[in-house]
Every structure is written in structure tokens, then in C-alpha cells.
């Protein structure tokens, strides 16, 4: 019979993810080792393997949680806009503000999502649900869902300006403006994420 998880198991996994995300952002996913992550966590490599069986498992859990968070943020922002009776442009502004606030607190996770999805396995994994999908495809599908949601918000906000031929370019231009803020917009700097939004 398997031993039950301790009450702090999930808290420790969360802490590992925070530290691993920082290691991946600082050194890159390929360069960061399980030994370095364990050292940064103040634990042994063996103890780290108690929580995650591989570096890729850490990366997947990090991206799995983060992409779920982004999708939840979209749903929450949409519900808030409806409850407050915001017009479509104000709702888009709220969505952009919500993304930027999330990016401010999740910069290292965002770096991993932008740079490291390619390192996830493309082998189908039956543990990820039905239909069977690979870890990489699951994360890419969620990224596509985020992009599609923002495209819909843009089309609602600017119905006369967005159409089938330009919506992808305009959506990606918006993401280009906000996705890379972590490279130049610093918390505590002369302009805040909230002011930028």
C-alpha cells in the first residue's frame, strides 16, 4: 500500500516549481540541472526526485499550472466584464491589464512558457486524458486557446478593424507588445505593470 502524502507535499512542490522556474529563467532549461535545482531548493537531489521524477516533469507541471492559470484568468476577466457591464473595448483593456498583472508576478513561468515548450515530450501520454495527447501538444493547445480568446476579444472591441485576413497579425502584435515586458519592465521601476496596462 502506498504511503499517504504529507500535508505539506503540495506546498513543497509549489516551492520547487518557483525555484525551478527561476533556474530555467536564469540559466535556460537545457543548462539547468536537477542537481542545481536541488541545491537552490536547499535539499538533496534524492529528495527532489521524491517530488518529481525528472526535470521534464518539473517543466511540464510548471507549464501545466501556468497555462491553466492563464485560461482561468481569461474566464474570470470575462465574467467580471459581464458583471460590470463593460463595453467590449473596456473588457479588452481589463483582459490586457489582467495579463500584465499576471506576468508581473509570474515572469519566470512566462519565460519558461515562451522559451521551453519545445523541450516537452511529443510522445503521447495516456495520463493526460482522452484523447491521448503529448505533454507538448497539451501546452501548445492551451497557448492556442489563449490566443483564440484574445482574438475574439479584439474582434469584439474593434469589429470594423479586425477581419479574417488581419486578425492573426493584430493578435500576435498585441502579444508581442505584452509578452516580452519581462525583459524591460521591472517591478519597482519608473513605470509599473499597472500603469503600463
Language-model features: where?
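Short coil/turn segments at alpha/beta junctions that flank glycine-rich nucleotide-binding fingerprints
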Residues: 26-30, 106, 160
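Short, basic, alpha-helical segments at the C-terminal edge of helix-turn-helix-like DNA-binding modules
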Residues: 64-70
Amino acid at each position: 500500500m502506498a504511503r499517504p502524502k504529507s500535508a505539506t507535499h503540495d506546498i513543497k512542490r509549489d516551492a520547487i516549481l518557483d525555484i525551478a522556474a527561476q533556474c530555467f529563467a536564469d540559466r535556460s532549461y537545457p543548462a539547468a540541472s536537477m542537481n542545481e535545482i536541488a541545491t537552490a531548493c536547499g535539499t538533496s537531489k534524492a529528495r527532489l526526485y521524491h517530488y518529481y521524477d525528472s526535470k521534464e516533469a518539473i517543466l511540464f507541471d510548471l507549464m501545466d499550472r501556468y497555462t491553466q492559470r492563464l485560461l482561468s484568468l481569461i474566464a474570470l476577466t470575462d465574467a467580471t466584464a459581464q458583471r460590470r457591464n463593460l463595453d467590449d473595448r473596456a473588457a479588452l483593456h481589463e483582459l490586457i491589464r489582467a495579463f500584465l498583472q499576471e506576468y508581473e508576478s509570474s515572469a519566470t513561468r512566462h519565460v519558461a512558457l515562451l522559451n521551453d515548450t519545445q523541450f516537452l515530450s511529443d510522445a503521447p501520454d495516456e495520463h493526460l486524458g482522452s484523447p491521448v495527447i503529448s505533454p507538448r501538444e497539451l501546452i501548445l493547445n492551451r497557448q492556442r486557446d489563449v490566443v483564440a480568446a484574445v482574438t475574439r476579444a479584439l474582434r469584439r472591441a474593434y469589429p470594423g478593424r479586425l477581419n479574417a485576413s488581419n486578425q492573426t497579425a493584430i493578435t500576435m502584435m498585441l502579444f508581442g507588445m505584452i509578452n516580452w515586458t519581462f525583459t524591460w519592465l521591472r517591478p519597482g521601476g519608473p513605470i509599473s505593470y499597472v500603469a503600463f496596462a
